């Protein structure tokens, strides 16, 4: 875990109330150290940031991990603690039992992890009364050379809109962007 902190950037004074609403939501979720930074401090924190940025929501406890190493470590830890993996085994049915769950009429378990990605709603809807629907969003990732890693030291988010999070810039655990 690299503790980089994150900034949600506001590019227009008209959008400041929405940023302050995000700040209030963070406070109610007990995000430590959360604060709004003004233009001068923001540009001291991120000198390469556009001059159009007027303020930002700063979360000093945010950070980045290497997702591949994290996933492998979690799987290794789970295996060390007796978890059994059933790869390439689609879940077709889940039934609640007195002691847990019966999956596909074959596997009995006290717990199961919903790691179905974009199909997680299908699995959720098999076991929960309240139904959900995941609406996937397309995105693109660009991985820059380590030389570009010096251009940003925090995770940088555009202020979210109804359409989504927009573009974000994330330093990697290995020093890239």
Where are these regions (language model features)?
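A structural signal for short hydrophobic beta-strand segments in well-ordered beta-sheet cores
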Residues: 9, 93-94, 169-171
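Active-site substrate-recognition segment that forms the wall
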Residues: 1-2, 111-177
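Helical element adjacent to the flavin cofactor pocket in flavoenzyme catalytic cores
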Residues: 57-103, 107-111
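A short, glycine/Asx- and small/polar-enriched loop/turn
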Residues: 14-17, 45-54, 95-102, 107
